């Protein structure tokens, strides 16, 4: 069955000529001239564009205001005027009309001491200028103290960026001087701030004094790339004048208006209600193991009253930056264990996407001046009992976090029927009392909110506050701002994939083990793979082409392409002594006897990490070697085939994504072994590694040098039945050396015999592998 993935890999670079023609046609563009109109600030729609939410939960907001057209105006106090001239000569001048006149000129590189003619204050004057640098441009600040006085040179700024700046503050003019990238600001003259106008001959920007560090960065390093690479349309300084109106609690204000568009300011009270969702997955076997307890996005719809009007609202709650915990009560099948459970703490964030049916959200496409004020809320965890087949139930209880507002941006919510342009409120977390614990275990005193019962049986959490935004909307209230259709198409596909993933994961309980082993040994081709899916037989050819194109970009396909380098680098990275003891999952109990040579514990942990890296590469090594033995890819492909046949939601559009995801996500916890006569070497993705005798299953020192040689020269086998399971099987039932060798080599016939004989240990192991086939 693993031939399925081999087929996909070997054919993933085949593309139909029709696809090539379509792609070439899609790349053709047409140049269109657009009149930007009055909303041309920085050449974009009237919104402060930034890259928004980053993967590290950092919100970045641009602060550069401009560019503005050359003009004469009264420069606001405590604002840097950042000037960006494009040619030499007079750059700007200013005066308080009584006793201070100042002017700035730009001189190109390599100019010897010479006199040049400038028009300053309406008069033609001769000024002595020079620039000794062959690479830097030079700004020179001249000042005179009387109407008929003489200009004198006060300061210079040498720069490669052709940027200078000054600011009025506390009756003084501040100016950048020196040589970039070490230029700094200082003041040079005292003026009357109220009556000092500035005339600028170049485009300029305004930066508040609070962003002085940012202004210094621009002076020394240049403007951001977007200011240099886009066609920016400067606007008049008059567009900066905003009418100050007293905002009511809930009102709509027309900020500006043209024949087709208007800017509306919406002020709204808001009541946010949200809930957390979780996923609790129990492992296969005897019923004592849980594989995952995790947070999931949660949609919640509700109504509330705002100024006598009933509002229908929709929220989506999601989390970012979760912390993974685990608990392992022992190695026996009847020992309570949780492979992974998620907890949100100080390093986590909660996102709440909010939409309601009011006018404010009808055209929420082009938005600026977005702000919000919200209160804090405490989320407390409840009790969750782990129902064991026998014995008292362990109970996870406690845990609490406080959500505090940390920003707001635009977002899109995905519902079952429509996409909603909404507001995303971002909350940072602080842990609160009480801590959480699991009764009847040693796990206690941990702070944060676990995913087991995050809602504490309450109907919802509630946050109150208000928001304000300015939105560009059509002047005719009956029109709606257009949105690209492609967004909705991809969004519908994501919804279908989400439903399909949930169905796939729930089908694991319906797979018969004996039939699965038979299916895993069949060399099915691509046509047979999808023969059981309704409405796809006629489209198998085009569908498989789409699958191959999707598979071409998968992690597995990329990893296979550089198999040789990844294997040699990973194997040679194990800088350990000649002999070390095996390390199992319960390392802390055996650490004192783990290293035969007496090296420190840090070395052991380092070796475990390196072994984990090697184990990930061993899958690639096995993947490229065709054998008659069963592999993890055989089982995952068989599970995939079974679920495809049973699925009621599979379609031609979703199959490529499902196939690609299955190759990467099915059976994440794998182990591989190589054989050396009567000794087996076994390593796991989790960093565990063993060396043991085949006949007795007694552990022996792990010879790293021999292991490195074996993984290069010998076949790599999937440890379908891993060392712990084999040892448990031998201790409880006893197996012959022949059976041991066949199980070590993952012989499908022997595996099927044990399953048909209802051996609980082997069945539990295979059921665990099936449970790991999740998307």
Swiss-Prot record:
SUPFAM superfamilies from the UniProt entry: Concanavalin A-like lectins/glucanases, VP4 membrane interaction domain
Keywords assigned: Capsid protein, Coiled coil, Disulfide bond, Hemagglutinin, Host cell membrane, Host cytoplasm, Host cytoskeleton, Host endoplasmic reticulum, Host membrane, Host-virus interaction, Membrane, Outer capsid protein, Viral attachment to host cell, Viral penetration into host cytoplasm, Viral penetration via permeabilization of host membrane, Virion, Virus entry into host cell
Cystine connections: 317-379
A GO cellular-component term linked to this record: host cytoskeleton
Site (Cleavage) residue list: 230-231, 240-241, 246-247
Region (Spike body and stalk (antigen domain)) residue spans: 247-478
Record carries keyword Coiled coil: yes
Keyword Membrane part of the UniProt annotation: yes
Chain intervals for the UniProt region annotation (Spike head): 64-223
GO biological process, one term: permeabilization of host organelle membrane involved in viral entry into host cell
Residue runs in coiled coils: 483-510
Region (Spike foot): 509-775
Pfam families assigned: Rota_VP4_MID, VP4_haemagglut, VP4_helical
Residue ranges annotated as motif DGE motif: 307-309
Misc remark: In group A rotaviruses, VP4 defines the P serotype. Some rotavirus strains are neuraminidase-sensitive and require sialic acid to attach to the cell surface. Some rotavirus strains are integrin-dependent. Some rotavirus strains depend on ganglioside for their entry into the host cell. Hsp70 also seems to be involved in the entry of some strains.
Protein name: Outer capsid protein VP4
Upper lineage: Viruses, Riboviria, Orthornavirae, Duplornaviricota, Resentoviricetes
